[in-house]
């Protein structure tokens, strides 16, 4: 028979678990990265979260370099010299289409959006209700993003000039997240785009960091 460990933890603490002296320190890390730039740096692409910590502290790092992985910016790079084994394989990235918004979700979204003020910084979760909320924010001004996740709907509001990130205390003029989840439209938009930055989860989801933004609004 086999055994597994169950380790309850907050998401922002997972980076520590994969750290050098963490309970989940790895013998080997297998990951997918972007093609390296002229300086040899590969981006973690869609997900920085605990990936950076796990990669930096694993005994062996095995990376698939994939030209379809977006080169996201922020604190989410690994140098090619720090990769032990490289596999070159170009595979399109799986897409996650937005959920269907029904009438109930639409009503909830409309109500929640009415509570958002100009200049607020938003955290948005996964599911139909956050998508519905985004649909009702088109009349707002200078919203900011400091969120675990960035989705297609956030890109739409950036393009409309609703999300500017100008009013944020922390990381102004940048939409901050720890991973991307959406369609090719999102991945293409985030590619080498300084308006979006991915950072490790122990930064993005840390309550002490989040609290440095005034008028923080969480919608899940």
Place the predicted regions along the sequence by residue.
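Conserved alpha/beta enzyme-core scaffold
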Residues: 1-220
């Amino acid at each position: 028979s086999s055994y597994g460990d169950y380790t309850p933890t907050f998401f922002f603490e997972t980076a520590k678990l994969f750290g050098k002296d963490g309970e989940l320190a790895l013998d080997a890390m297998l990951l997918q990265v972007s093609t390296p730039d002229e300086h040899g740096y590969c981006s973690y692409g869609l997900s920085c979260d605990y990936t950076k910590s796990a990669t930096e502290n694993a005994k062996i790092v095995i990376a698939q370099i994939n030209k379809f992985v977006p080169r996201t910016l922020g604190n989410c790079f690994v140098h090619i010299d720090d990769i032990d084994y490289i596999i070159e394989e170009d595979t399109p990235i799986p897409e996650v289409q937005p959920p269907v918004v029904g009438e109930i979700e639409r009503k909830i979204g409309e109500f929640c959006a009415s509570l958002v003020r100009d200049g607020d910084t938003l955290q948005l979760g996964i599911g139909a209700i956050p998508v519905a909320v985004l649909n009702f924010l088109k009349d707002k001004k200078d919203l900011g993003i400091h969120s675990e996740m960035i989705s297609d709907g956030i890109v739409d509001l950036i393009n409309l000039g609703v999300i500017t990130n100008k009013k944020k205390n922390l990381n102004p003029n940048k939409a901050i997240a720890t991973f991307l989840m959406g369609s090719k439209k999102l991945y293409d938009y985030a590619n080498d785009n300084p308006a979006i930055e991915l950072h490790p989860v122990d930064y993005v989801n840390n309550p002490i960091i989040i609290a440095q933004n005034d008028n923080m609004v969480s919608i899940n």
